[in-house]
């Protein structure tokens, strides 16, 4: 596979014309949108009409409004048999593409063949007023309609407002845009920008303690009882216990979301051979469940079990009922993990009572994209209907879709409160597949920015490469231009955050296991995708899954190689120090070795200088490297991800489904390759275990002669270290390590020889 050029995937600093970055514009009217370029629009708000003349035999009409500006035309919906219609519709025409000097508003009557003309009104664009927030909205006015000759008609007026503004206008999000003139009225909803909120997620704990007075179907048989606990599509089961008064005391944790839709359903089941008999059932509404905010236990309650469903809270008289002892509560002290822990955008607990005050503000300007790959074919040409999705905390934002452009300009700005700097904002770019049909939204790429890597109150304007990994290899699908500013409201609180635990206290007081967290994260992803998919326009499941990095933990050869090289890169400093020290010991540079001898003597004479010297050295290194500190935020690195040199078969394996959908021969080949890799890892792990077992065998007397020698050596060293000053021992040890090569030999040292002869448990392995 041919390797891509390095510059193609590099981060580029840009200089957009934005107020926040100090750009100078000739327009004195500015807005709060200071991280994006101003886009000029002509707005036409069509409110209503009255006393329209009839055009059919009944004296009525089916009116609608058509707004024409050059080659662009926007149309409202029509009303049947109504002479006083109300539309309240806003049209936004981009002034970058205007090729006309006036705008025409026509009122027409909907007909089967040719629509009839009712009246019109024209406006000279040079006379249209300008309005930018925080100015109050422009009040609409009544205008008498004119005929085609320009004369006033007898009856018929239209109320509308027309003004020039920017994308900061309140009418912008819900307006019809000239950029989407080819989109039908039904598809306009799917291209509008929206703000979404993730559902409030809770961990829900059920402690199944015991049952009492169970009534099995066969009275002479001791039942094998298990309890099945279900919430929505989540279900867990206790172990089997015998008897009519069984006890379990098992904990189960589920994920649920407000508003609570699914009840908690408890089934007590008796296993009779291969069949299961339900001995009792209880339904509990989650809205009635208490909430816990700390580690203090809540009291347990007895609940009646019925053969038929009994909703908790409803009054129903029963003479006798089996009971189940449960401790149920919603956990408000945990943070429900719905993202990968490496890219979390929110670390607060579920309960708002436990939230701390915010430390700052994150402002994101989504300016434009360049060179996007065509994702579909329309009229024989490749095109893209791109939109962006940004997620930080529970707030998701979606820009409007720019139809038919590989270089779209959004210029939309959004703001989030920041509660922890160790969080990540994620921006994804997608192709809208729902404009002309029900296809899926295609992924173009995404960008992650960690807030702790940003300087406060500085505006970062960069063009980020959009990179995706396909079965054919790594591919750049374009670039997205962003402006980011992290403002700090309390510098002390922000620094204090660095001393606090990453997650809420409950994660450490009562930690959940790794297996539980993985399972709960999976169900949390499903809940978030389901709730956001109900919005209008919906945020599709494929978009939510991509933003939440669903499936990121699935194994692949590429990821394993990337992590291995990351470890080697982290250890490269220690390896370099080791090589440098080896050169010192072998007198490769005599002057440096002599200086190390002098330093060693000073530190041994004054041992109290050792720790201050180490910290002073680290301080000087940090100050020295400040001059070369990173000036740009981090971005996707194909070399760090090992995506530039990955083979085709490894990529095909990475994109395989789980469980696999490949043929048996291919799976056998990959299995053999995995066995080969695992064999090498197994050898390394075995060698480490051997060294550890040799260390333990020093005093285990497995080798009696070796243990006797070691014990005798320890006794001698105890006396030597007791009577010899520490400085003398340190000097002698240092001089021995730094001795001249003429006093060295290539054979292993005595301690190494002794250690390698110690027994390990390899002899006991099959």
For each feature predicted by the language model, list its residue ranges.
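C2 and C2-like phospholipid-binding beta-sandwich domains
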Residues: 1-17, 30-32, 47, 64, ...
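Calcium-regulated, polybasic anionic-phospholipid
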Residues: 41-83, 208-246, 366-406, 433
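Extended cytosolic scaffolds built from alpha-helical repeats
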Residues: 508-627, 636-638, 713
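Intrinsically disordered, low-complexity PEST-like regions enriched in Ser/Thr and acidic residues
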Residues: 3-42, 175-203, 339-361
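Short Pro-Gly-centered beta-turn/loop motif in secreted/extracellular proteins
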Residues: 92-100, 253-262, 415-423
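Hydrophobic lipid-interacting interfaces of membrane-associated proteins
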Residues: 49-50, 209-214, 367-372, 489, ...
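Transmembrane alpha-helices of multi-pass eukaryotic membrane proteins
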Residues: 89, 250-253, 412-413, 589-618, ...
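Multipass alpha-helical transmembrane domains of eukaryotic endomembrane proteins
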Residues: 554-590, 630-718, 740-766
């Amino acid at each position: 596979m041919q390797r891509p050029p390095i510059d193609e995937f590099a981060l580029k600093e840009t200089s957009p014309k934005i107020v926040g970055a100090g750009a100078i514009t000739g327009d004195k009217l500015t807005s709060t949108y200071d991280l994006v370029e101003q886009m000029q629009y002509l707005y036409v708000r069509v409110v209503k009409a009255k006393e329209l003349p009839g055009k059919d035999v009944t004296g009525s009409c089916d009116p609608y409004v058509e707004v024409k500006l050059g080659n662009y035309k926007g149309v409202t919906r029509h009303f049947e048999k109504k002479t006083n219609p109300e539309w309240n519709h806003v049209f936004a025409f981009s002034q970058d593409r205007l090729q006309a000097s006036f705008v025409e508003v026509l009122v027409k009557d909907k007909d089967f063949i040719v629509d009839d003309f009712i009246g019109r009104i024209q406006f000279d664009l040079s006379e249209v007023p300008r309005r930018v927030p925080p100015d109050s909205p422009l009040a609409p006015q009544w205008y008498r309609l004119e005929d085609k000759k320009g004369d006033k008609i007898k009856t018929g007026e239209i109320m509308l407002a027309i003004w020039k503004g920017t994308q900061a206008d309140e009418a912008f999000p819900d307006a019809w845009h000239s950029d989407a003139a080819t989109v039908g009225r039904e598809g306009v909803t799917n291209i509008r920008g929206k703000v979404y909120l993730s559902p409030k997620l809770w961990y829900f704990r059920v402690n199944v303690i015991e049952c009492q007075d169970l009534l099995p179907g066969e009275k002479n048989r001791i039942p094998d009882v298990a309890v099945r606990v279900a919430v929505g599509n989540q279900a867990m089961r206790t172990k089997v216990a015998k008897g009519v008064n069984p006890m379990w005391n098992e904990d189960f944790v589920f994920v649920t979301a407000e508003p609570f839709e699914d009840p908690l359903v408890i089934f007590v089941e008796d296993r009779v051979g291969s069949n299961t008999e339900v001995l009792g059932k209880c339904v509990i509404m989650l809205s009635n469940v208490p909430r816990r905010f700390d580690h203090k236990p809540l009291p347990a309650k007895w609940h009646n079990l019925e053969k038929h469903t009994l909703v908790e809270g409803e009054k129903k008289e029963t003479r006798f009922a089996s009971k189940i002892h449960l401790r149920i509560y919603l956990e408000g002290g945990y943070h429900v993990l719905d993202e990968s822990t490496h890219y979390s955008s929110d670390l607060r607990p579920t309960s708002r009572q436990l939230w701390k005050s915010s430390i700052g503000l994150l402002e994101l300007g989504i300016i434009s994209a360049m060179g996007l790959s065509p994702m579909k074919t329309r009229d024989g040409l490749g095109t893209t209907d791109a939109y962006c999705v940004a997620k930080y905390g529970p707030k998701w934002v979606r820009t409007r879709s720019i139809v038919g452009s590989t270089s779209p300009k959004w210029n939309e700005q959004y703001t989030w409160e920041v509660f922890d700097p160790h969080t990540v904002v994620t921006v994804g770019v997608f192709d809208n597949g729902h404009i002309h049909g029900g296809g899926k939204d295609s992924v173009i790429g995404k960008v992650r920015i960690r807030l702790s890597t940003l300087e406060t109150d500085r505006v970062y304007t960069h063009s980020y490469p959009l990179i995706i990994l396909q079965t054919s290899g790594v591919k750049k699908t374009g670039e997205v231009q962003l402006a980011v500013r992290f403002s700090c409201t309390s510098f002390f609180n922000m620094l204090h955050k660095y001393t606090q635990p990453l997650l809420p206290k409950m994660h450490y007081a009562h930690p959940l296991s790794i297996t539980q967290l993985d399972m709960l994260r999976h169900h949390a992803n499903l809940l978030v995708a389901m709730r956001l998919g109900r919005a209008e326009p919906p945020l599709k499941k494929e978009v939510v899954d991509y933003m939440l990095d669903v499936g990121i933990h699935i194994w692949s050869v590429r990821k394993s190689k990337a992590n291995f090289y990351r470890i080697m890169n982290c250890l490269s400093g220690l390896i370099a120090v080791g090589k440098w020290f080896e050169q010192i010991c072998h007198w490769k540079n005599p002057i440096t070795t002599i200086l190390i001898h002098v330093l060693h003597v000073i530190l041994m004479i004054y041992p109290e200088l050792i720790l201050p010297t180490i910290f002073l050295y680290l301080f000087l290194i940090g100050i020295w490297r400040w001059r070369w500190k990173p000036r740009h935020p981090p971005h996707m690195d194909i070399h760090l991800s090992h995506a530039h040199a990955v083979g085709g078969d490894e990529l095909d394996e990475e994109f395989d489904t789980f469980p696999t959908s490949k043929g048996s021969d291919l799976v056998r080949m990959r299995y053999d390759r995995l066995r080969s890799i695992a064999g090498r890892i197994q050898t390394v792990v075995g060698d480490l275990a051997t060294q550890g077992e040799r260390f333990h065998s020093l005093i285990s007397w497995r080798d009696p002669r070796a243990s006797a020698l070691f014990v005798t050596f320890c006794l001698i060293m105890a006396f030597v270290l007791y009577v010899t000053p520490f400085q003398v021992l340190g000097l002698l040890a240092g001089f021995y390590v730094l001795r001249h090569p003429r006093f060295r030999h290539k054979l292993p040292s005595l301690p190494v020889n002794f250690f390698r002869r110690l027994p390990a448990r390899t002899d006991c392995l099959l």
